[in-house]
Amino acid sequence: MKVAVYPGSFDPITNGHLDIISRASKVFDKVIVGVLINPEKKGMFSVDERVDLIKRVIKPFNNVSVQSFSGLLVNFMENNDSNVMIRGLRSVGDFEYELQTSLMNKKLNPNVETVFMMTSLEFSFLSSTAIKQVAVFGGCIKELVPDEIIDDVLRKAKEFN
């Protein structure tokens, strides 16, 4: 069974993230969405809230699950019998960053492979940071995040502001 891990902060999960999850679920036997616990980074949503939001939007995918993790990604992958990491790319800038991260992970565990998936064109401008800014300032996020979580993002944006 080929298990892939799709790591990130997902604060919040976007339609771009969901697009990568959907496409990866067709390539791999199992996809684990790994939500990074980063105590140095204050997110809009707590880690538990992010896991809950993701659980709600991945229901249609039988082979996708979500877990939070802290520490090294390669250790999380090893604990989940995975040697494949999925990363979405929107731009050349993403590639530069992801290449360095991929090489470091390869150095830490030579068995880890990174699969880069190009973001679909309609989502190439999306980022969780941009969505938070739009939501905080009262803009429309309807086509930016999954419908199931729009109300959660808008409610949290009011609190965050």
Swiss-Prot record:
<feature type="site" description="Transition state stabilizer">
    <location>
        <position position="17"/>
    </location>
</feature>
<feature type="binding site">
    <location>
        <begin position="123"/>
        <end position="129"/>
    </location>
    <ligand>
        <name>ATP</name>
    </ligand>
</feature>
<dbReference type="GO" id="GO:0015937">
    <property type="term" value="P:coenzyme A biosynthetic process"/>
</dbReference>
<dbReference type="InterPro" id="IPR014729">
    <property type="entry name" value="Rossmann-like_a/b/a_fold"/>
</dbReference>
<keyword id="KW-0547">Nucleotide-binding</keyword>
<comment type="subunit">
    <text>Homohexamer.</text>
</comment>
<feature type="binding site">
    <location>
        <position position="17"/>
    </location>
    <ligand>
        <name>ATP</name>
    </ligand>
</feature>
<protein>
    <recommendedName>
        <fullName>Phosphopantetheine adenylyltransferase</fullName>
        <ecNumber>2.7.7.3</ecNumber>
    </recommendedName>
</protein>
<dbReference type="InterPro" id="IPR001980">
    <property type="entry name" value="PPAT"/>
</dbReference>
<feature type="binding site">
    <location>
        <position position="73"/>
    </location>
    <ligand>
        <name>substrate</name>
    </ligand>
</feature>
<feature type="binding site">
    <location>
        <position position="9"/>
    </location>
    <ligand>
        <name>substrate</name>
    </ligand>
</feature>
<keyword id="KW-0548">Nucleotidyltransferase</keyword>
<comment type="pathway">
    <text>Cofactor biosynthesis; coenzyme A biosynthesis; CoA from (R)-pantothenate: step 4/5.</text>
</comment>
<feature type="binding site">
    <location>
        <begin position="9"/>
        <end position="10"/>
    </location>
    <ligand>
        <name>ATP</name>
    </ligand>
</feature>
<keyword id="KW-0067">ATP-binding</keyword>
<keyword id="KW-0173">Coenzyme A biosynthesis</keyword>
<feature type="binding site">
    <location>
        <position position="41"/>
    </location>
    <ligand>
        <name>substrate</name>
    </ligand>
</feature>
<comment type="similarity">
    <text>Belongs to the bacterial CoaD family.</text>
</comment>
<dbReference type="InterPro" id="IPR004821">
    <property type="entry name" value="Cyt_trans-like"/>
</dbReference>
<keyword id="KW-0808">Transferase</keyword>
<keyword id="KW-0460">Magnesium</keyword>
<dbReference type="GO" id="GO:0005737">
    <property type="term" value="C:cytoplasm"/>
</dbReference>
<keyword id="KW-0963">Cytoplasm</keyword>
<feature type="binding site">
    <location>
        <begin position="88"/>
        <end position="90"/>
    </location>
    <ligand>
        <name>ATP</name>
    </ligand>
</feature>
<feature type="binding site">
    <location>
        <position position="98"/>
    </location>
    <ligand>
        <name>ATP</name>
    </ligand>
</feature>
<feature type="binding site">
    <location>
        <position position="87"/>
    </location>
    <ligand>
        <name>substrate</name>
    </ligand>
</feature>
<dbReference type="Pfam" id="PF01467">
    <property type="entry name" value="CTP_transf_like"/>
</dbReference>
<dbReference type="GO" id="GO:0005524">
    <property type="term" value="F:ATP binding"/>
</dbReference>
<dbReference type="GO" id="GO:0004595">
    <property type="term" value="F:pantetheine-phosphate adenylyltransferase activity"/>
</dbReference>
<comment type="function">
    <text>Reversibly transfers an adenylyl group from ATP to 4'-phosphopantetheine, yielding dephospho-CoA (dPCoA) and pyrophosphate.</text>
</comment>
